[in-house]
UniProtKB/Swiss-Prot annotation:
UniProt-listed InterPro entries: Class_I_gatase-like, PRibForGlyAmidine_synth_PurQ
Assembly: Part of the FGAM synthase complex composed of 1 PurL, 1 PurQ and 2 PurS subunits.
Pathway membership, UniProt: Purine metabolism; IMP biosynthesis via de novo pathway; 5-amino-1-(5-phospho-D-ribosyl)imidazole from N(2)-formyl-N(1)-(5-phospho-D-ribosyl)glycinamide: step 1/2
PANTHER family named in the record: PHOSPHORIBOSYLFORMYLGLYCINAMIDINE SYNTHASE SUBUNIT PURQ
HAMAP family linked: PurQ
Name of this chain's protein: Phosphoribosylformylglycinamidine synthase subunit PurQ
Organism: Bacillus pumilus (strain SAFR-032)
Localization annotation: Cytoplasm
């Protein structure tokens, strides 16, 4: 499986994402600069965290106009797995691929620490390696991770089982403690916590590794034929 890691001005988690794929999974991965216009030849797309374009105007608001973003939308529409982490999640929201918006954390402070996540849905290609209701430890690093949506959108997320992860505690004011959601089709996941920073016990937790392993396993089950 071959992954693309999108690199934007201000990205700072692209190297971590690259490491998780190449060194922990042993899969192919390449950096793709924001001025590129095609993601042909890639099987999965990773939009990492950081402060794209300085987070001016609004987190992800400028990044959505980058040359590479139509290709990201195309990959999502084609059913390829697309993962947006932290700022990457915010960008996917700005693109309209995922619903909702991010507001300032409820205490107006930047949060940077490991947190408890609860796996709400383990029937996605990102979470199939977990157990439903499983508690995992994954770090967060955000100042604007307070997920917000209106009541109709929330009802739809619940009805369609699109809530992938919730926080064990209300760390930032997110509606229903939402930490990660998928699109209706289930091939796009946006999450504020950083699974790429939790792929080795030396980092304090390896709980994020199952997420990447799930992506690869589901892709192989679909695309690789064994005799």
């Amino acid at each position: 499986m071959k992954f693309a890691v999108i690199v934007l001005p201000g990205s700072n988690c692209d190297i971590d994402m690259y490491h998780a794929i190449q060194d922990e999974l042993g899969e192919q991965v390449e950096y793709v600069w924001h001025d590129e216009t095609s993601l042909d030849g890639f099987d999965g797309v990773l939009v990492p965290g950081g402060f794209s374009y300085g987070d001016y105007l609004r987190c992800g608001a400028i990044a959505r106009f980058s040359n590479i973003m139509p290709a990201v939308k195309k990959a999502a529409a084609e059913g390829k797995p697309v993962l947006g982490v932290c700022n990457g999640f915010q960008i996917l929201q700005e693109l309209g691929i995922l619903p909702g918006a991010m507001r300032r954390n409820k205490d107006l402070k930047f949060i940077c620490r490991p947190v408890e996540l609860i796996v709400e849905n383990n029937e996605t290609q990102f979470t199939s390696g977990y157990q439903k209701g499983e508690s995992i430890s994954v770090p967060v690093a955000h100042g604007e991770g307070n997920f917000y949506c209106d009541e109709d959108t929330l009802a739809k997320l619940i009805e369609n089982n699109q809530i992938a992860f919730t926080y064990g505690d209300d760390i930032n004011g997110s509606v229903n403690r939402i930490a990660g959601i998928t699109n209706e089709e289930g091939n796009v996941l946006g999450m504020m916590p950083h699974p790429e920073r939790a792929v080795d016990s030396l980092l304090g937790s390896a709980d994020g590794l199952k997420l990447f392993q799930s992506i690869v396993k589901n892709w192989r089950d679909t695309h690789v034929t064994t005799a």
